[in-house]
Amino acid sequence: FVQFHPTGMVWPPSVKGTLITEGVRGEGGVLKNSDGERFMFDNIPEMFQGEYAETEEEATRWVNAVVADERPDARRPPELLTRDVVARAIRREVRAGRGSPHGGVFLDIASKRSPEAIKRKLPSMYHQFKELANVDITTDPMEVGPTCHYTMGGVRVDPDSQETSVPGLFAAGEVAGGMHGANRLGGNSLSDLIVFGKRAGEYAAQHAKDREAMSDVDAEEVERQAETMLAPFHREQGENPYTIHEDLRLMMQDKVGIVRTEEDLVEALEALTALRERAATVRIGGNIGFNPGWHLALDLENMLDISEAVTRSALMRQESRGAHTREDYPDTDDVTWGKQNLVTRQAEDGSVEVRAEPLPEMPEELKELIKD
């Protein structure tokens, strides 16, 4: 489950994907297509019908009340629907040919708030667009589009200690399989980090304290790993890692992005195989002293592993749930998939293996908390 934030910068290319805070929409910013239409009113899912404003007048009343720190007597604007809903709606407008010049939509705060109010309430956004895109958001709309934001899955950890399946290795936060299920709510990542980061730190400290001695280090294995890491410096021919990284990014966005199909996912797996072959022969220059190209060359293997794990899991999960949307399986299947987790691991032959495992039974103390 990969979450896409609905509003990231789409232009210029050097800053594509840079996040635009939801505060812009909270302050009254509206999403419009190239025809000037507020399309979110036409994209309220059935499950949210009745909970969001159905007219611009009602949406404006809600914003004005909130900005004035008053209790609103109206429903919130549909621009504030969950991230997956807004991201899919933007994608739909772009694919229908109603997108902005650079492949996004327009986020307009200029027509809703005075320049003084925008600079006072959204100073970082004002400076971000002024400096990075030469756009004055007090007079002109922003071009925005969905950007990859958060991974809900992660490595398997013990829920109490946060220890992974590797003894002595602890994990917390986005890297760990956590509490967010298929769709994280905004702000919950911070709570996750505070609670489980504290646990991980405490148990890691206790683990270190209880150890009597360090394990012996295999010198030959260290040498082999060093040779592998330094190999890109010694190749006479090979591709630039930045080229492969960009091709990987574009392919995953296109084939394994906001909306997925079996055809696209199968094509993505074929593309990943080809990208792995290219990544195995990357060549870099310079030396080991602060060399971003070398860092990227080393990261590519991890990026490819994660990309394949996400793709294979998305192909296996024949339903739509949270941030995972299958166009060919649009419904949520609680009977089959509501009771299973998908677990990826490295098979004996080195390939990525995916299998379904039943959800563990909820501990009694948690059941009691839910009752209360």
Residues covered by each model-derived region:
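Short beta-alpha connecting loops at secondary-structure transitions
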Residues: 12-17, 76, 180-189, 227-234, ...
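Long, amphipathic alpha-helical stalk/connector segments used for oligomerization, subunit docking
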Residues: 207-292
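An anion/pyrophosphate-binding glycine-rich loop and adjacent beta-alpha core
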Residues: 1-131, 203-209
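C-terminal amphipathic alpha-helical interaction region
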Residues: 281-372
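Active-site and channel-lining beta-strand-loop segments
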Residues: 28-41, 147, 153-162
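A conserved FAD-binding loop/helix module that cradles the flavin
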Residues: 117, 166, 178-204
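A glycine-rich phosphate-binding loop feature that marks nucleotide/adenosyl-phosphate handling sites
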Residues: 2-12, 143-151, 213-230, 323-335
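FAD-binding beta-loop-beta segment adjacent to the flavin cofactor pocket
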Residues: 149-170, 175-176, 184
